[in-house]
Amino acid sequence: MYKRQIDSNLGFAALVPYDKSFKDANGQWQKIKMAQFQMMYKGFIQLAIRSGYYEKMNYAVVYEDELVSYNPITGEIEFVSDFSNCAQRNAGEQDKIVGYYAWFKLKTGFSQELYMTTADVDNHARKYSQAYRYDIEKKKSSSKWTTDFEAMALKTVIKLLLSKWGILSVDMQRAIQDDQKVYDEEGNGAYLDNRPDQDTEEDPFAIEGSAEEPEELDITE
């Protein structure tokens, strides 16, 4: 699929097994095995590094005592100048996480950063992940957004940053397109998640040809 292998053992990508439920011609419920390809945030970083376009990259969880100000209109963000007085990160105070940050600098000298508040990320997940909305409604834990919100939040901010402002190699373009595609036993791919709950705004990750409503999935990992 890619010119250079993406190793799932290193946390770059994963195939998540699903049981897809459907009614057969006799009206009986049946299940078929499917697998969803998921790029992890480390995978996007690896592909960016391999492209040779990027001089530096970084990403981070942001704690309340590290943030001075954030302007959602201009995108400008200011952190404290002295992190030695910031204790929340070292204490592992997860309830003090206020946002997620990613930054890159190209070899041309161009640099760009992106910050999303925790609320921004949560709203994004609710809007574009049917599985996450299902978990919230049914109080279940079938979505990666539910079981590992931090990893998915970092992935979202990195993916948005690269897709909006980065230089995308062929592999990076393919990874953005293939992310969250679900495959059946015959290798046919479709997008069963990552759809907005309403069509009022364009999905920045939308794929053409995914007009069907996503079906309910049972994760079997």
Regions found by a protein language model. Give the residues of each.
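Glycine- and charge-rich intrinsically disordered segments
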Residues: 172-221
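Accessible peptide chain termini
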Residues: 1-3, 172-173
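Binding-interface segments
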Residues: 3-168
